[in-house]
């Protein structure tokens, strides 16, 4: 396997791994976004549902006198599945609606056959306002007239009200504060796969890549046709140019061979006498010199006469081999 093939394989594998990682990251992000959106929708729907239930509970008026009458009319808390008779609306001319348990009835002005109900404000109480300035003390009021003694109410069973139970909806109240987050809902079914996207616009041409490795040698081509003979014009010799500048000194070359011995030169003048040199070594013993003259007579010896012993001194020297 060549280096080029191994490099190409590694690059292709790295690119494929990068594309798969990007696709997986995009898929995970899309799923998380869809789940988050679904949870937000479920939470919003749950808030709306709880708000509706709370509004219905407020409209029912739990703990009020009318609720007690309705419970008693339908059999109380221990009622069975049977329904109480529907309330009967008054027919014909409008008159006072008697309230059970009271000997007198309220004065109701005449009108149409529609239900005469007062609109109750079921909105929650708003925040307390700022404390105002203290006002001046008022004048003492006039003593009231003593009232009449009340009449004892007979002990009668509560009767259902003859009026309508549902009143027209009032004006919407101010928006309440945001409630606590609800319980996380169940995960929904997996959505349908989306449509494939369209191809994007072609990108700008990239930069030129590095020079590739030289390719294999191609097959030798066929021999071409023989060309025409060329003409070689011979030009005239031009004028000699100016001498160029002297170049830099070259490196020192190797030592040359010894030259031939030249002829002896002219004898020079006699030089100045030099300094006296040191004593040389002793030379070899020279030849024996001639015999010396006879010495003087010694004091301890009587000299012979010249006539008697002329050769006595020479004989003595030969005997003792004295060397001078």
UniProtKB/Swiss-Prot annotation:
Keywords: Collagen, Cuticle, Disulfide bond, Repeat, Signal. Residues 119-324 are annotated as: Disordered. Residues 136-151, 168-181, 210-223, 235-246, 261-273 have a biased composition (Low complexity). Residues 1-30 form the signal peptide. Disulfide bonds: none annotated. It holds the Pfam family Col_cuticle_N. GO terms for cellular component: annuli extracellular matrix; collagen trimer; cuticular extracellular matrix. InterPro entries: Col_cuticle_N (IPR002486), Collagen (IPR008160). Residues 314-324 have a biased composition (Basic residues). It comes from the Eukaryota. One of its GO terms (molecular function) is structural constituent of collagen and cuticulin-based cuticle. One of its GO terms (biological process) is negative regulation of multicellular organism growth. The keyword Signal applies. Residues 296-311 have a biased composition (Basic and acidic residues). Residues 129-152, 170-229, 235-294 are annotated as: Triple-helical region. Belongs to the cuticular collagen family. Collagen polypeptide chains are complexed within the cuticle by disulfide bonds and other types of covalent cross-links. Nematode cuticles are composed largely of collagen-like proteins. The cuticle functions both as an exoskeleton and as a barrier to protect the worm from its environment. Dose-dependent regulator of body length and shape. PANTHER family: COLLAGEN, CUTICLE COLLAGEN LON-3. This is Cuticle collagen lon-3. It comes from Caenorhabditis elegans.
């Amino acid at each position: 396997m060549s280096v080029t093939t191994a490099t190409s394989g590694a690059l292709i594998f790295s690119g494929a791994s990068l594309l798969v990682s990007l696709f997986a990251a995009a898929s995970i992000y899309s799923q998380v976004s869809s789940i988050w959106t679904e949870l937000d929708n479920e939470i919003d729907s749950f808030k709306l549902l709880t708000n509706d239930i709370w509004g219905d509970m407020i409209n029912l008026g739990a703990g009020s006198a009318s609720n007690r009458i309705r419970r008693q009319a339908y059999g109380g808390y221990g009622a069975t599945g049977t329904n109480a008779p529907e309330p009967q609306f008054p027919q014909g001319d409008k008159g006072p609606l008697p309230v059970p348990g009271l000997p007198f009835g309220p004065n109701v002005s005449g009108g149409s056959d529609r239900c005469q109900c007062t609109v109750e404000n079921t909105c929650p109480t708003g925040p307390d306002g700022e404390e105002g300035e203290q006002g001046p003390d008022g004048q003492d009021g006039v003593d009231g007239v003593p009232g009449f003694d009340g009449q004892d109410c007979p002990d009668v069973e509560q009767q259902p009200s003859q009026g309508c139970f549902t009143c027209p909806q009032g004006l919407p109240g101010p928006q309440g504060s945001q409630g606590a987050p609800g319980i996380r809902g169940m995960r929904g079914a997996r959505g349908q796969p989306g449509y494939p996207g369209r191809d994007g616009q072609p990108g700008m041409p990239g930069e030129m890549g590095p020079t590739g490795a030289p390719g294999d040698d191609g097959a030798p081509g066929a021999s071409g046709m023989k060309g025409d003979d060329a003409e070689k014009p011979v030009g005239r010799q031009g004028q000699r140019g100016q001498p160029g500048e002297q170049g830099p000194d070259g490196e020192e070359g190797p030592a040359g061979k010894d030259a031939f011995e030249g002829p002896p030169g002219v004898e020079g003048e006699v030089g100045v006498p030099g300094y006296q040199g040191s004593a040389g070594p002793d030379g070899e013993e020279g030849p024996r010199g001639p015999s010396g003259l006879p010495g003087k007579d010694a004091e301890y010896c009587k000299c012979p006469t010249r006539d008697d012993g002329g050769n006595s001194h020479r004989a003595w020297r030969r005997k003792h081999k004295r060397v001078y």
